[in-house]
Structures are given as C-alpha cells and as structure tokens.
Amino acid sequence: MDTAGMEHSVSWISSNSDELILRSWISSRMDIAELHRAGDDIKEMMKSEGYYSEPSKYEAELSDGNITFAYSYPIKAFEKFLGYYDRENRIAFNPSISMRTDFSFCLAACRYRKNGKTDTVVLDGYADNKYYKKAKFALDKFRSEYSINGSFDFYIKRYRRYQKAKGLSESSAVAAAVSRALISNVFGDDAAKDDIFVSRYARLVSGSGTRAAHDGISMWLSYPGMDSRDCVAFKVGKSNENLNYGVFPKYSDVATDNAHSIAVNSVFYGTWVSEKFSNVKRLISDHFDINDLLKIGENDMLRLNSILMSGGLIIQTPDSLRILKEILKFKSKNEGFYFTADTGPSIAIFSFDRSLIDEFRENVNDEYIEGSYDFKGYNNRMRDFIREAQEYFTQTPGEDEEDRL
C-alpha cells in the first residue's frame, strides 16, 4: 500500500482539529487500509474487464474572451455514496454507480478573461453564492494544477420537467455541464469530448457530477488513499432502453452537504461502505447486470435512510412515505417492480414491464414524471441559451462582481 499517498491525502486537515478528531474516530471503526486494497482490486478488475482506461492529458490553449457551451443531464444512483474520505480532493469512501435520466438538464456557458481577478457564477439568472463558492474551490485547484492565470465567468441555466423537487441530482448536471464548458474553453473540443477527463473536474464541483459526465450507466471510481488524478468515472454500460422508469418529484429543504457530514458519524457507516466494495466486485464480474443494479438501488436507498436517521436526519416526507408504503404493498404482489431514491424524498420506480408501472400509478395520484432515453431535448433550448449567455457577457464585459455575490 502507498502509505505516502495516503498521508498526502489527509494532510489538508492538519490545521483543523475537529476534522482530525473526526478522521481519527472514523479510522478507529473502519479498516482504511483494507478499503484501499479493495479499491485497488476494483481498479484492476476494471482494467481486466476493459472498463478502465488511463485519463488522457491535454495542453491548455487559452484565448482571452473565448466563450464555450456545454450541456448535461442528471443521474439516478443505484450504488450510492455519502461522505468524503478526502473532502479537499472530493474523494469518496466508496465507488458509486448510476444511470443517466432526463428529468431535467443543464446548459452552461464559460468565458475566460486573461486579466480577470474574480470568477463569477450566474445560475438561473441570479448571482449564486453557493455555486460561486463551489466554483471558486474547483477553479482554484484547476488553475493551480495547470498554472493558469486569469478568471472564468459562468452563465448557467437549469431546465426542469417539474416545478420543485429534492433528490433528482440537479447538482450533478450542473457540475458536469460547467466542467465540460470549462474543459472546452481551456483545452478545446477533443478534451471536451473526453468524458473521463471531464469527470475528473466535475468531481470538484459535486461528487455525483463525476458520473453525470457520462451517458448510459457509469461508475465513479473512488476509495481512500487513491491518487486524486485517477478519481474519475467510467462508462460501464449503455442505457437499457427496455427499462421503463419515472419519478414522483417531492421537495424538502434538507441540505445534501449536511447529509454527508451526518452519514460519516453513523455507527452503521463503516459496514455500509464495506458492503459496497463487495457489491461492486460482483457487478464487475457480472458485467453490471441491470437486475442486480435495480435490487442494489432498492436496498441502498433503505440503508442510506437508516444511516441518516441514526444521526437524527429524516429526509423523507409524509408524502414520500405514503408513496413508499404503496410501493412496498404493490411489490409484495408483483415481481419485477423496483424503486429507489437518493438524498431526498423524490422516489423513482422501474420495471421492464410497462403494465406494472401503469397499474401502480392507477392508485397513486401524485405528480409523476415519465423518464425516457431521448437526451436531445437540450437542442431545443441551446440556441436561445447561447443568445442569452452572449447578451449577458456583453453586458458584463469583465468588471469585478465580487460585491454582488
């Protein structure tokens, strides 16, 4: 085991006694060295099965005032993650797996300013302090890695098929879209088409964004002590278009960042994480069997909620619990019907038998968004978005907007 690498990965917390105490407490209940070995084993299995490829390298080609555009769709997780082993480098404790969904999408524009001193972020028409902080964190690390001077402006817009919801991974789409727009701006089109390379930097904005850089089914390779440059996502399967899916969008005001910190304090966290490595090894051997993924998605949703409840955080609502009760009752009489949810009360359902979904919906009158595999809807919005972004950049030619955030 590369202990030097592991020492480097935790060096960022040396000045923060609370983080150091938490890390020590977690390590006392989890075999970090064993998780590292299991992660290395998974990496080798990915190589052997042809899923893994070394991230490519690109040279920066910056042009002052250059504007680039990108899009992304969100994901729905089967093998989930909560909690970072290395928050500074956004390295999770375990690998995670998801599929792309079309419940929303995100468009992003990125402008480079050679002499700029302050990055700016406008999300859905407003200067957004939360995403500004996330962007600044990611951009500072990005600029340091490639010795880039200057600043970047982002104009971002989300397009939803619902009014308001939590747990539909909008942040993953934002992270992947802004990362691809940035990569396109700095390295050009070839780099922007490299989903693995894009996923490396989407990770710095949002962990789930790593997987949103890919279409189909993807896995984020992450584990304690790994080289942060290898902490990327890989496509492990195409979308199974025979699988019907949809979601009941529900809203809550639970902050995901809060869920991350609560999860790692749970007495059940170590067991939950260790089980994931066994699941991923089996999935690789079985070529990511979709039926296994669907079952894992169900079980992992229940475990995730148990872990958060053990820390006093309840992410479900009366509405989502009512739907979940109906789902469990329906499942007891119907095989081939699956469900899952991420860090929020929006519950997704799946089945290869369309009639099962139709039958279930007859007894549940809540708003329902039917999923599809048509990921070209962004094209209908891109022209107007490009015009809006260009108008915005023209109106804000590069003044320091820090005071507005």
UniProtKB/Swiss-Prot annotation:
Catalytic reaction annotation: (R)-3,5-bisphosphomevalonate + H(+) = isopentenyl phosphate + phosphate + CO2
Classification via SUPFAM superfamilies: GHMP Kinase, C-terminal domain, Ribosomal protein S5 domain 2-like
Pfam families: MVD-like_N (PF22700)
Top-rank EC class of the record's enzyme: lyase
Pathway info: Isoprenoid biosynthesis; isopentenyl diphosphate biosynthesis via mevalonate pathway
Top-level division of the source organism's lineage: Archaea
Alphabetical UniProt keywords: Isoprene biosynthesis, Lipid biosynthesis, Lipid metabolism, Lyase
Molecular function in Gene Ontology: carboxy-lyase activity
EC number: 4.1.1.110
Biological process (GO), any one: isopentenyl diphosphate biosynthetic process, mevalonate pathway
Further remarks about this protein from its record: It is proposed that Thermoplasmatales adapted the classical archaeal mevalonate pathway by replacing mevalonate 5-phosphate decarboxylase (MMD) with two specialized enzymes (mevalonate-3-phosphate 5-kinase and mevalonate 3,5-bisphosphate decarboxylase) in order to produce isoprenoids in extremely acidic environments. It was found that at low pH, the dual function enzyme MMD is unable to carry out the first phosphorylation step, yet retains its ability to perform decarboxylation.
Record function comment: Catalyzes the ATP-independent decarboxylation of (R)-mevalonate 3,5-bisphosphate to isopentenyl phosphate. Functions in an alternative mevalonate pathway, only present in extreme acidophiles of the Thermoplasmatales order, which passes through mevalonate 3-phosphate rather than mevalonate 5-phosphate.
Subunit details: Homodimer.
Protein family according to the UniProt entry: Belongs to the mevalonate 3,5-bisphosphate decarboxylase family.
Protein's name in the database: Mevalonate 3,5-bisphosphate decarboxylase
Organism placement in taxonomy: Archaea, Methanobacteriati, Thermoplasmatota, Thermoplasmata, Thermoplasmatales
